[in-house]
């Protein structure tokens, strides 16, 4: 049996198996995690992940969906700017094609991003954005260089969240903030759907947190919790159907998504968050 990657507890139970990956839940801290970790998870983030989702993961059109999410990105920045009204240098981890960075730049932030997908990096650079291939562990600085480091819909993909937060702490200036938006394993949708919850989706999602264990991890990493909330998203009809189709492996839902998109109603928006995400802001002590 594995040990919990957060608290090293051996009190873990088998949770489920999906996509040929075993998933466990720590009975001490509640973390849901994949074990053993897949060795080739990075291969998932090819062009198909951002344009097509033919292999059952990702987006039909990441650019279209993230443009829809501009209101959510602005809400994230509103929360950050309550703590850092002067703005400053912002590093976005897992920046994809740079939709969030475009908005942050327009609001006066000095932006940069990291992304493991070469396809996404190329798209972001075509927009004139400062985005480099790599992970946070690849970032280097002689001294703390950033005022904010963001992980939006990224933390659940990370194989080593503890090490990632320690690196973020070292890269942040005193009083800098880390912002995380990630699925909440204690949310109402998670409780209702159980093992069928959309976020239980390896090898895409490797670690699923709740507010308590994520706050504890941040505090142990040297951060002071400033805000814990849920920021709803406006989701398009096509996106909702695509997520459900991928999760249920349903050709019928996939066809419905494509049909509605061609009919022009796939872009209809719903101001809700069936995903049950959690948004946490923490400040470097």
Stretches with model-predicted labels:
Residues 162-177:
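A short glycine-rich, Lys/Arg-flanked "PGG" loop and its adjoining helix->strand segment in the class I
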Residues 180-207, 212-218, 240-245:
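Short, glycine-/aromatic-enriched active-site segment of Class I SAM-dependent methyltransferases
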Residues 2, 227-285:
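A C-terminal cap/extension of S-adenosyl-L-methionine-dependent methyltransferases
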Residues 159-163, 190:
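Short N-terminal helix/helix-N-cap motif within the alpha/beta-hydrolase-1
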Residues 5-12, 212-229:
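A SAM-dependent methyltransferase catalytic signature shared across enzymes that methylate proteins
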Residues 1-152, 162-165, 230-231, 243, ...:
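Conserved N-terminal segment of class I S-adenosyl-L-methionine
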Residues 152-159, 204:
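Short catalytic micro-motifs in class I SAM-dependent methyltransferases
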């Amino acid at each position: 049996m594995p040990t919990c990657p957060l608290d090293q507890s051996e009190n873990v139970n088998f949770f489920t198996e999906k996509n040929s990956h075993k998933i466990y839940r720590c009975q001490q801290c509640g973390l849901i995690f994949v074990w053993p970790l897949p060795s080739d998870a990075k291969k998932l983030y090819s062009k198909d992940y951002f344009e097509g989702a033919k292999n059952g993961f990702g987006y039909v059109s990441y650019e279209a969906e993230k443009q829809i999410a501009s209101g959510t990105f602005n809400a994230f920045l509103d929360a950050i700017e309550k703590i850092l009204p002067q703005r400053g240098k912002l590093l976005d981890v897992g920046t994809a094609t740079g939709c969030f960075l475009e908005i942050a730049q327009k609001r006066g932030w000095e932006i940069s991003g990291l992304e493991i997908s070469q396809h996404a990096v190329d798209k972001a650079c075509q927009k004139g954005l400062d985005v480099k291939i790599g992970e946070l562990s690849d970032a280097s600085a002689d001294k703390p260089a950033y005022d904010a480091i963001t992980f939006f819909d990224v933390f659940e993909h990370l194989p080593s969240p503890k090490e990632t937060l320690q690196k973020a702490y070292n890269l942040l200036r005193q009083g800098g903030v880390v912002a995380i938006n990630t699925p909440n394993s204690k949310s109402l949708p998670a409780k209702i759907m159980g093992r069928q919850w959309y976020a239980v989706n390896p090898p895409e999602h490797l670690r699923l947190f709740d507010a308590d264990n994520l706050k504890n991890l941040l505090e142990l990493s040297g951060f002071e919790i400033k805000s814990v909330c849920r920021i709803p998203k406006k989701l398009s009809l096509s996106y909702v159907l695509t997520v459900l189709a991928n999760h249920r492996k349903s050709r019928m839902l996939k066809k419905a998504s494509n049909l509605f998109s061609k009919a022009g109603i796939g872009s209809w928006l719903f101001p809700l968050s069936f995903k049950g995400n959690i948004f946490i802001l923490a400040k470097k002590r």
